[in-house]
């Protein structure tokens, strides 16, 4: 098949959407399909060969993101690619462009719901109005947007449940998680060099991976260090708009010896960082899947996660990890349970991750594409 992936965010931005696009495009190409990535233009210095770009400008509230200029004269470019299906990632400007091209060409579109937009309003919205009102307006927009593609894809069942609760009525839905490379993220990797690099000897290491942003609730993870034994360290991997504020919080809480920040870590080292650790943690209630949790599980790590949204579909309490509520004390308790049960949980965590292999999810996606294309042709 010839597949156009239109995404609201792409490299050099690093987030779950970008990872999802990169992973999906690789899995589809490995299966013998042709994939075209279409993204906002980050400027000449950051362009990648083989990616089609729409003119864009930086988003002032979050300068790591780029907003495509609307309208633009690039629609004919997409039409010239002669694709069988358009796969939209996001609900903003690139997504709207995808719908316009789909309608003008008759090429069916599907959309992956990647981001819980309402949860970001408090932190990044440029609109001068109460967050509650913005949230209601966002759901009005999403109810209108999400009924237009031929199918809406959620990474977990929790996403589709949230649609139902907020009156979203897509034409069709499917649950297909973002895949992971289970050959790259695996048991038995040697993380000793990473431990040495960051000054760890016999300490237990709890890792948090992802954008350091306000909606990720990282403050709970940081404060949990106060309730952990002296030989436990929290390692926060990644950067983002809350990076400096979270570093300041560590200092304010007097936790400089127990919480370390690595900043951005290259993709080719990430699996080693997981393997250098003992537990993966996330206090976020924002995730549509929690991709880094699955990656860590593939490396045998038990997961200490908040008991909300998509984590409920990935983590089984007491089997491959432990849940906690919203307090630092409860987070610390879940971490200690993970540490105490690490050897028992490691193979179970790996077994969970294997269900999310790139190959398996890529095949599911192709089957969905073929079904959607067939339905459109016969309708």
Each model region followed by its residue ranges:
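N-terminal subdomain of nucleotide-sugar transferases
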Residues: 1-56, 366
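A conserved mid-protein helix/loop that constitutes part of the nucleotide-sugar donor-binding site
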Residues: 19, 204-227, 241-247
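Nucleotide-activated donor-binding/catalytic signature segment of Leloir-type glycosyltransferases, i.e.
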Residues: 245-265
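Donor nucleotide-sugar binding/catalytic pocket of nucleotide-sugar-dependent glycosyltransferases
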Residues: 53-55, 132-135, 139-189, 200
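Short alpha-helical donor nucleotide-sugar binding micro-motif in glycosyltransferases
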Residues: 146, 264-265, 272-277
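Conserved acidic donor-binding segment of nucleotide-sugar-dependent glycosyltransferases
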Residues: 317-318, 322-328, 336-342
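Short hydrophobic beta-strand element within catalytic cores of glycosyltransferases
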Residues: 302-305
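Aromatic "clamp/platform" in nucleotide-sugar-dependent glycosyltransferases that forms part
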Residues: 285
């Amino acid at each position: 098949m010839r597949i156009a992936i239109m995404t609201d965010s792409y490299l050099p931005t690093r987030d779950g959407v970008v990872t999802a696009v990169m992973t999906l495009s690789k899995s589809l190409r490995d299966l013998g399909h042709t994939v075209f990535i279409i993204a906002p233009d980050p400027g000449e210095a950051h362009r990648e060969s083989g990616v089609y770009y729409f003119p864009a400008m930086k988003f002032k509230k979050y300068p790591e993101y780029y907003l495509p200029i609307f309208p633009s004269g690039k629609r004919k470019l997409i039409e010239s690619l002669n694709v069988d299906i358009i796969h939209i990632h996001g609900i903003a400007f690139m997504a709207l462009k995808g719908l316009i091209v789909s309608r003008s060409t008759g090429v069916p579109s599907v959309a992956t719901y990647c981001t819980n937009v309402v949860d970001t309003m408090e932190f990044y919205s440029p609109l001068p109005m109460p967050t509650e009102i913005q949230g209601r307006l966002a759901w009005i927009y999403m109810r209108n947007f999400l009924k237009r593609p031929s199918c809406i894809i959620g990474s977990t069942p929790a996403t589709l449940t949230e649609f139902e609760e907020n009156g979203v009525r897509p034409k069709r839905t499917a649950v297909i998680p973002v895949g992971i490379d289970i050959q790259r993220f695996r048991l038995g990797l040697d993380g000793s060099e990473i431990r040495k690099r960051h000054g760890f000897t016999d300490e237990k290491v709890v890792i948090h991976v992802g954008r350091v942003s306000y909606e990720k609730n990282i403050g709970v993870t940081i404060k949990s260090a106060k309730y952990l034994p002296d030989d436990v360290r929290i390692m926060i991997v990644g950067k983002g708009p809350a990076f400096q504020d979270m570093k300041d919080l560590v200092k304010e809480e007097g936790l400089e010896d127990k919480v370390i920040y690595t900043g951005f870590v290259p993709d080719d080292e990430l699996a080693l960082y997981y393997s250098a650790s003992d537990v993966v943690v996330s206090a976020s209630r924002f995730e549509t899947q929690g991709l880094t949790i699955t990656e860590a599980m593939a490396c045998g790590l038990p997961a200490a996660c908040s008991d909300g949204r998509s984590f409920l579909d990935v983590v089984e309490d007491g089997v491959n990890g432990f849940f906690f509520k919203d307090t630092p004390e409860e987070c610390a308790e879940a971490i200690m349970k993970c540490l105490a049960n690490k050897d028992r949980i490691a193979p179970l965590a790996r077994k969970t991750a294997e269900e999310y292999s790139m190959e398996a999810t890529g095949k599911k996606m192709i089957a969905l594409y073929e079904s959607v294309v067939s339905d459109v042709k016969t309708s």
